[in-house]
Amino acid sequence: MKKILLSIFFSVTLLSAVFAQESWQKVKIYSNDLKSDIAMLRKVGVTIDEGFTGKDNSISVFLPASDVEKLRSTGIRFDVVISDWDAYYKSLPVLSPEEQLAVRQQSKQTYGVEGLTYGTMGGFYTLAEIYAQLDSMRARFPNLITQKVAIGTTLENRPIYAVKISDNPDATENEPRALYTALIHAREPAGMMTVIYYMYYLLENYNTDNAVKYLVDNREIWFIPCINPDGYEYNRSTNPNGGGLWRKNRSLNSGAYGVDLNRNFGPYSYWNSPNGGSSTVASDIDYRGPSEFSERETQAIKNFAVGKNFKTALNYHTFSNLLIYPYGCWTYLPPDSATFIEYASDMVAMNGYSPGTSWQLLYPVRGSSDDYMYDGDPEGTGKVFAMTPEVGGDSDDFWPPQSRIFPLAIENLRPNLYYTWVAGDYVSLASYQLNKQYISPGDQVQMNLTMKNKGLSNAENITVTLESLSGLMTVSNGTVNVPLVTSRGTYTTTSPLTFTIAFNAPIDTLVKARIVTSKNGVMMSADTLGFITGVPTFVFKDTTDNPLLNWTVTATPSTPKWEATTTDFHSGPTSFTDSKSGNYANNATVTMATTNPISLVGYSNPKLSFWTKWSTESDYDCGVLMISTNNGSTWTALAGSLTKPASGLGKQTPAGMPVYEGVSSNWKQEQISLSAYANQSIKLKFELRSDVGLVADGWYVDDIGIMVYSAVPVELVSFTGNISGGMVNLDWSTATELNNRGFEVQRSLNGSEWFTAGFIECAGTKTSSTNYHFSEQVAGTGTIQYRLKQIDFDGTYKFHGPVNIESDVVLSYDLMQNYPNPFNPETVIRFNTASDGNVSINVYDILGNKVSTLVNGFMKAGGHQVSFKPEGLTSGIYFYEMVTPGFSKKLKMLYLK
């Protein structure tokens, strides 16, 4: 399971006369039964809150030095990792002024942010410096941010300040509202620096970034950078250079200082939930207070939020690289869990955090700000999609080194922007449909889109544009307007986008494009698409609904194991998953390997393709796809477009091995080239690996196949002919076509000489059936043969036919127009004779001079044709004349040299 932050502090009752903080140690406690040992520690006065669980059945926690001796008395094995936290923190590297300047310059160059500086408390801002930053923002950007507004006052008479960023900051507008808070726990300043960095990003990029301008103009974005001023100032008084570990506020209860503000929110049923997610002992660090909203700070947040109708909120904490959503107080998901999961999945894809509820990822929590904001006061605050980012990894602790301040803020920049977007309208591509199953060179393709408004407000007047990212693709109709997409709804376009693949596009080539969604010229989202040219032929394809038919399944422990499920799939009715009912097991290895070898002999560039989704513990659990060329004796992990390098922790070993890990909640197609294994016999294996700790839903795969992409031949499925009303009618059809320039229709009256009767142009490449028709006057009596010369754009050709037409038509004398006309270098002249006799056909120039004799002699009755290929003649108009006893006719033709 995910690195779980559990900080175990032994409860030390702080009498009112005691103000000094003890030194702290970081210890690593080893446990064979985590739940049992935690229960035992609670009995001796241990409070469980924030810390870090290792993958060797250990918990790394901070303890007061005096409590380390108490730990020894329990008999639980432990190691001291940091013997003196204060000394350790003071020994952390400090950035020089030159190094600080370089970091800030890089921030300005890459993200346009230069306002964030380093504070004087270990690089973090003190409370006074936070207030000064808010004043500076107002002075620099008076038209974008309000003056700081006191929304409440603490017990020690310190104001709790909020500010709003918007295009009319001093006015209240009917715009979607988003909220960002930090420092509800006094020892977590990295969240505050992350929030202030985002504020500067909005302010300093307003005039240069259209998306930022749109958000500021169309949202009211509120910030409370420090909810707990008294606790934060107390840390400054004890540790002026940073590193203070005081967590709560400074109210006095039963002789002990402090209430955990993130356990003090209502309503009563949430605050007093039976899950034990807070302490009732005043000296404990997660003490919930004497009643819900007993503290001035939580009262201030409640009063501030009432009537604001916030749509989204991020309440920043540290640390553990998590994104936590409701419920914490109940061990079931909220009614809007699908929305929370979608938002969280999108956001963690940007920074690699792990999403889930507190009881899924950490421990039960009751009285939290997220639960209250979501549905704790529907009449007052409405429904706020509130979540908690836990910023920073294990080595960052509560006070990260100076070198980590900017990176932590930057890794949350895109999630912050996303959550401001979805407070209002935010439309992106949900899916697309093509009018062709496969795409080949020369294809003209139509695309219809299904767009989803992930936002919490209706989206109107949206523009969707198809952009080519390849020189092999030309967009002909690339824009569609979407009039309205309701909040959380979808819209399917009715007017298709169209594009053409170049005739010279190589087979088996990835052609990329992207769908850009915008409003008023401002890009909301961009989704990249890829199409592989050619038609796949499957070397191996699993079309079964039972993995045991093609795969050998093993599992340690014996269950759960790979099975078919009907509850989630890419193409129905099933997909394969490692844990059909619920989560995968701890310390599990679950494999699915092809039973029989797959031959790739004769294929130069085979591709493995499958659809997949997964949810595993980041950095520790994973899915691994492997290949073997020796019948399974040894296996090699395959890297794909969706894999990540293994962390080297837990079951993600060795480090750097390609794995599927973290969360990818939507079905995605994975395609992996197997060209390195061409002309060999292979086996494939899907393997889910987990260590001891967090468990999750696991790995899903569907539509597994190995394919080769090839050209589509011109496949003629029929070719027929008949005579009707003195006309020859030819009909033929194709099943598929590739690079087909057209069909030249050829005729023969004697079975040996072939003449062109006409030409039918084609459209290049088609993967669906096409019908063709050609007709002409009957050219003679007896057997007339026709054939088709199919010509590609590269000049190559292939003959189809012939078909025989039996003609008993009685012909009259006639001379027909030459074909082709104009012509160069040769043309064909057809003529009919009604009876046996002498015939002459001569060619004359425009002055009447005879330049060629084509026919001069006895001809049988019937249809005839003769070719004319000028030699030594100039371009121009020529006449040809047929003369027989009792018949003559002259026609004109054009020779273009």
What are these regions (language model features)?
Residues K26-K28, R236-L434, V475:
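Metallocarboxypeptidase
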Residues L497-P536:
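Terminal connector regions
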Residues V539-T589, A639-K668, G837:
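Extracellular glycan-recognition surfaces and repeat-rich motifs
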Residues T629-A676, G751-H773:
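Exoplasmic/lumenal beta-rich domain surfaces
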Residues D703-L811:
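Short, compositionally biased serine/threonine- and acidic-rich segments at solvent-exposed termini, linkers
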